[in-house]
A protein has these predicted regions:
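Short, surface-exposed beta-edge/turn micro-motifs
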Residues: 5-6, 79-80, 133-138
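Amphipathic, charge-rich alpha-helical segments that serve as recognition/docking helices
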Residues: 32-89, 148-161
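Short Lys/Arg-enriched alpha/beta "domain-start" segment
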Residues: 75-115
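Long, compositionally biased intrinsically disordered regions
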Residues: 104, 126-188
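A C-terminal functional module that forms or caps the active site or interfaces directly
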Residues: 115-121, 168
């Protein structure tokens, strides 16, 4: 959350879920969003699929998308593609805006996952090494600027799950709190109880590049362990 504007920059889906559960509060990590150390990337979807060329074609045709197919090359901009395989680059003929492209990426992900293939999320820069990996199909998503993320958040529009990837100086993890604390207390009481709760846990500082729960992070991690 931006410390100045209090705009929720990441985690809107979790925030909405808490609201539906009747929570009055939510734990938040406040950041100076204009800090140059804070960067924005994206989460690409990686699959190890059987017959990826046919699967990509079937996914796009099932969603009534008109596309052109070109040979995959290191010179291609991966963020402009809709689906990439090790042989082909599938790109829409009529390119929608960034938000629509994100929504389409999620629909394609659901289609391919529905064919019993497991999706793995990795940073956009992982696509440069993927030709040497087991993955053979990638669904890229556009990369938003900070200004675009702020504009989207303040307009009330919601980006799909796991699209933006924020890189912050230090990322807290394991801030697990009982729902009771978020529902039945005032802000002052909830903050005091949260402070005591986190102070009672062991803090494990992990260096950039560490993996937690199958996800690799570029920033330092502050993991609150039970």
């Amino acid at each position: 959350m931006d410390k100045q504007s209090l705009v929720i920059l990441d985690g809107m889906h979790r925030y909405n879920a808490l609201k539906k559960l009747g929570c009055q509060h939510a734990p938040a990590c406040l950041v100076e969003y204009d800090d140059e150390r804070i960067g924005v990337g994206a989460w690409f979807r990686f699959f190890n699929a059987k017959e990826p060329e046919s699967l990509a074609t079937a996914a796009l045709e099932s969603l009534s998308q008109k596309y052109e197919r070109n040979t995959t090359s290191h010179q291609n901009d991966p963020t402009r593609a809709t689906i990439i395989t090790k042989l082909s680059n599938f790109q829409l003929i009529a390119e929608p805006d960034k938000l629509a492209r994100c929504c389409l990426a999620v629909r394609i992900e659901k289609y391919i996952s529905g064919q019993s293939f497991r999706c793995e999320y990795a940073p956009e820069n992982a696509v440069t090494q993927w030709l040497n990996s087991n993955a053979n199909l990638v669904i890229p998503v556009p990369i938003f600027s900070k200004a675009e993320i702020k504009e989207t958040a303040t307009s009330g529009r919601l980006l799909p799950h796991k699209v933006t990837r924020h890189i912050i100086p230090s990322r807290p993890l394991g801030v697990d709190v009982p729902l009771d604390l978020l529902i039945n207390y005032t802000s002052e009481e909830a903050n005091e109880k949260l402070d005591r709760l986190l102070s009672s846990r062991r803090l494990d500082r992990k260096p950039p590049g560490s993996t937690v729960d199958g996800r690799r992070y570029q920033e330092e991690l502050l993991v609150f362990e039970r």
